């Protein structure tokens, strides 16, 4: 199953490759492509104020509802350098129940668990998965990386399962 998250990237595909966009729409309907994230553009959450983040989410969700008939419930922000405690409440009010991040990296801020419940303001909470791996893979190495992922996680309970691949996927869409 494929997924991607930023509305602006889908817009560019729609404008520049309409046939590919139509194929993606079909794959979403078939359940072979999952819309996650839902932001218009993946933000850095250190500087923007809450209103900016809310508008970013609203624009992205509007696009995905119009073009695909879906509203994502998992927010993705792989490469943000900050996650304000106020973000939890914004995510909850936008309909998200899960949040996927890569930062802070385990070397910068070690947690015992990759998956945890983040409690924010006004009783809001969201299940977070912090990936300890990169969010891409080297072309041609997906099989090797998948084997390593399965070996590394064979004894761990699974609450989130994320696998990042970047090999060409023309045959799938």
Model-predicted segments: where are they?
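Catalytic-domain carbohydrate-binding cleft regions of carbohydrate-active enzymes
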Residues: 1-166
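A short, hydrophobic C-terminal helix/tail in secreted or cell-surface proteins
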Residues: 167-173
């Amino acid at each position: 199953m494929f997924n991607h998250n930023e509305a602006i990237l889908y817009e560019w595909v729609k404008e520049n490759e309409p046939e590919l966009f139509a194929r993606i729409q079909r794959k979403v309907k078939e359940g072979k492509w999952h819309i996650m994230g839902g932001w218009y553009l993946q933000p850095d959450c250190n500087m923007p104020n809450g209103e900016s983040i809310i508008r970013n989410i609203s624009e992205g969700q509007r696009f995905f509802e119009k073009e695909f008939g879906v509203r994502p419930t998992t927010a993705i922000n792989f490469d943000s350098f900050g996650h304000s405690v106020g973000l939890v409440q914004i995510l909850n009010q936008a309909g998200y129940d899960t949040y996927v991040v890569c930062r802070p990296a385990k070397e910068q801020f070690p947690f015992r668990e990759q998956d945890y419940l983040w409690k924010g303001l006004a009783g809001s909470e969201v299940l977070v998965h912090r990936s300890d791996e990169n969010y891409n893979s080297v072309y041609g190495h997906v099989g090797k990386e998948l084997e390593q992922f399965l070996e590394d996680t064979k004894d761990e309970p699974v609450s989130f399962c994320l696998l990042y691949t970047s090999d060409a996927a023309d045959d799938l869409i």
